């Protein structure tokens, strides 16, 4: 099954209250998801959005995942292989930040065939604007 997933994370303060939003599109249908955490970072919410989107898939899929986070996109396309090879340490030999989320995302990604796409945020991209609003709703619902 071919699936499009659009993801976004948001944070009020960094760290601070954060939210994530997801749009899944498949077989002409759409499903949205959102949530939040009271104390987190923007990067953690970007990762959580991708994790929650992939967790929603019930079987292996062909996935086009769209994010406005270069951290997420480059992490999955470029950096993660080196991190794994180096025991989850970066080029400075420091432990990778958010390693537990990266590991979870890597495990989920291994189930699917994923193309990771970067889109410019806040540029009138319809789906990105929708998941941005969902991420902010995740923050609002915390209070």
Swiss-Prot record:
Domain RNase H type-1 intervals: 1-140
Binding site for Mg(2+) 2: 8, 132
GO cellular component assignments: cytoplasm
Binding site for Mg(2+) 1: 8, 46, 68
Gene3D superfamilies: Ribonuclease H-like superfamily/Ribonuclease H
InterPro entries assigned to the protein according to its UniProt record, in alphabetical order: RNase_H (IPR050092), RNaseH-like_sf (IPR012337), RNaseH_domain (IPR002156), RNaseH_sf (IPR036397), RNaseHI (IPR022892)
CDD domains: RNase_HI_prokaryote_like
Cofactor(s) named in the record: Mg(2+)
Molecular function as annotated in GO: magnesium ion binding; nucleic acid binding; RNA-DNA hybrid ribonuclease activity
Catalysis performed (reactions): Endonucleolytic cleavage to 5'-phosphomonoester
EC number: 3.1.26.4
Record family assignment: Belongs to the RNase H family.
Function noted in UniProt: Endonuclease that specifically degrades the RNA of RNA-DNA hybrids.
Oligomeric and partner information: Monomer.
Protein name: Ribonuclease H
Originating species: Legionella pneumophila (strain Lens)
């Amino acid at each position: 099954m071919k699936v499009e997933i659009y993801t976004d994370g948001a944070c009020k303060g960094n760290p601070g209250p954060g939210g994530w939003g997801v749009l899944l599109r498949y077989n002409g249908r759409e499903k949205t998801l959102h949530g939040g955490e009271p104390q987190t970072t923007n990067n953690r919410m970007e990762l959580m959005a991708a994790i929650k989107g992939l967790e929603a898939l019930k079987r292996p899929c062909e996935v086009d995942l769209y994010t406005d986070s270069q951290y997420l996109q480059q992490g999955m396309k470029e950096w993660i292989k080196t991190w794994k090879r180096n025991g989850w340490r970066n080029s400075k030999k420091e432990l990778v930040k958010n390693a537990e989320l990266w590991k979870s995302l890597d495990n989920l990604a291994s189930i699917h065939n994923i193309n990771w796409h970067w889109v410019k945020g806040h540029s009138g991209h319809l789906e990105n604007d929708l998941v941005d609003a969902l991420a902010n709703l995740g923050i609002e619902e915390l209070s």
